[in-house]
């Protein structure tokens, strides 16, 4: 066989192999050094990606004309498919998409990657089947349709609708790729799944935070705009802002992000309007220092650090996370007190993560606790109560609180795969 015929045969074999490994409208190119590029046109709503939970994470960059649109870590199936997850293509319809994929560093050569089952099971589709397949899905408590969920975030009430955002991984039922998932309800029992609201960017993934209804347009984003302030978790943890003018369905990130910078591990912003000072207050935690930090602002964009609380108070065993601050009436006295909520992991009364609280006075700058430092008050003594925070703008002056019904001791080990 001459060289020309051999070359032609090799090209034919490569073509047949490529067709066997993907839909004909998806091109898979194996480039060596654990690098694979997948090319397709976004002419359907989703790219369905096969996931194997025990597989190492592959780093995926979504490119259009060479520009990175989104980045995520995905456990692409190697030996078997556990389930499918959707990459939402609706914002990129008609565009030529390139997925630049780097598989795990310990893969020895490109032939390992070529044999992975994910390539032949990727598919473009206009539908994603999210009907429940789990025997143990709660009927009463909120769960995501698919993927991972932990802390409730950014919750607000407006126009008869309760909006719940939450820490969400759209690409597996394990922790990672932190995004704000979104559900809505008119009764806090029956939930409608909405599209994910805020994805990660160059500053990092989207950790916990809060939202407020800016009724008086203090931010300049419009009267009644929804303003979300959250932690950008990249190489460091900084605080960022996004706003919505369609009642929280979509958000635009503020061009001046980050709005608060720190050299500490600071996160989980909670913003409230303080009627006594006519200012916004923001509380967040310096997680490893066991401190709650207090800030004030007139416009939600520019913040002044006012004070701190926490050294030596309450449970100090684990990291502090997800604070909240609210003023409540003291029953039968006509008096009001401030309640500062701080979640802790580990260090709960029955192990793992839990929610503690402090009662005292707050003047917009400093919190003074009524109890002695060694006194710890627990909101719940059970094991399934963490990241408890309240809705903003609740009707009738209520303070409505929701917690994550799980525990970091076993959250990754519950007997489900479609969601956790």
Residue spans of the language-model regions?
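Beta-rich carbohydrate-recognition and catalytic domains
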Residues: 24-269, 273-321, 327-381, 396, ...
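Anionic-ligand-binding alpha/beta catalytic cores of soluble enzymes and soluble regulatory domains
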Residues: 390
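Glycine-rich, charged/polar anion/phosphate-binding loops
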Residues: 385-387
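Bacterial Sec-dependent N-terminal signal peptides
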Residues: 1-24
């Amino acid at each position: 066989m001459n060289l020309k015929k051999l070359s032609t045969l090799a090209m034919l074999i490569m073509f047949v192999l490529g067709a066997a490994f993907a839909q004909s409208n998806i091109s898979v190119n194996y480039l060596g050094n654990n690098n694979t590029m997948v090319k397709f046109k976004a002419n359907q709503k989703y790219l369905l990606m096969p996931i194997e939970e025990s597989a190492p994470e592959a780093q995926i960059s979504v490119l259009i004309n060479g520009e990175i649109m989104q980045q995520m870590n995905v456990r692409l199936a190697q030996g078997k498919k556990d389930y499918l997850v959707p990459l939402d293509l609706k914002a990129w319809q008609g565009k030529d998409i390139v997925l630049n994929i780097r598989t795990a560093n310990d893969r020895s050569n490109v032939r390992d990657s070529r044999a992975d089952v994910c390539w032949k099971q990727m598919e473009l589709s206009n539908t994603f089947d999210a009907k429940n397949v789990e025997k143990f899905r709660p009927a009463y408590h909120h769960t995501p349709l698919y993927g991972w969920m932990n802390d409730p975030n950014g919750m607000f009430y407006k126009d008869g609708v309760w909006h719940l955002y939450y820490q969400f991984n759209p690409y597996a039922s394990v922790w990672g790729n932190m995004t704000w998932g979104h559900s809505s309800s008119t009764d806090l029992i029956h939930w409608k799944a909405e599209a994910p609201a805020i994805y990660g960017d160059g500053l990092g993934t989207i950790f916990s935070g809060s939202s407020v209804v800016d009724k008086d347009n203090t931010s300049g984003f419009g009267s009644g705009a929804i303003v979300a302030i959250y932690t950008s978790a990249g190489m460091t943890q900084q605080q960022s802002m996004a706003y919505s003018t369609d009642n929280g369905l979509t958000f635009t990130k503020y061009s001046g992000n980050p709005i608060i910078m720190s050299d500490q591990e600071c996160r989980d912003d909670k913003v409230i309007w303080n009627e006594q000072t006519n200012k916004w207050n923001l509380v967040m935690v310096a997680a490893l220092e066991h401190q709650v930090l207090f800030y004030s602002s007139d416009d939600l964009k520019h913040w002044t650090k006012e004070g701190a609380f926490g050294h030596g108070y309450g449970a100090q065993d684990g990291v502090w996370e997800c604070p909240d601050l609210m003023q409540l009436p003291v029953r039968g006295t006509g008096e009001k007190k401030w309640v500062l909520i701080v979640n802790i992991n580990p260090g709960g009364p029955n192990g793992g993560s839990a929610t503690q609280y402090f009662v005292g006075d707050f003047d917009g700058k400093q919190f003074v606790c009524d109890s002695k430092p060694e006194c710890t008050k627990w909101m719940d003594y059970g094991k399934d109560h963490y990241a408890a925070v309240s809705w903003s703008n609740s009707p009738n002056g209520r303070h409505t609180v929701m917690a994550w019904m799980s525990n970091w001791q076993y959250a990754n080990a519950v007997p489900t795969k479609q969601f956790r």
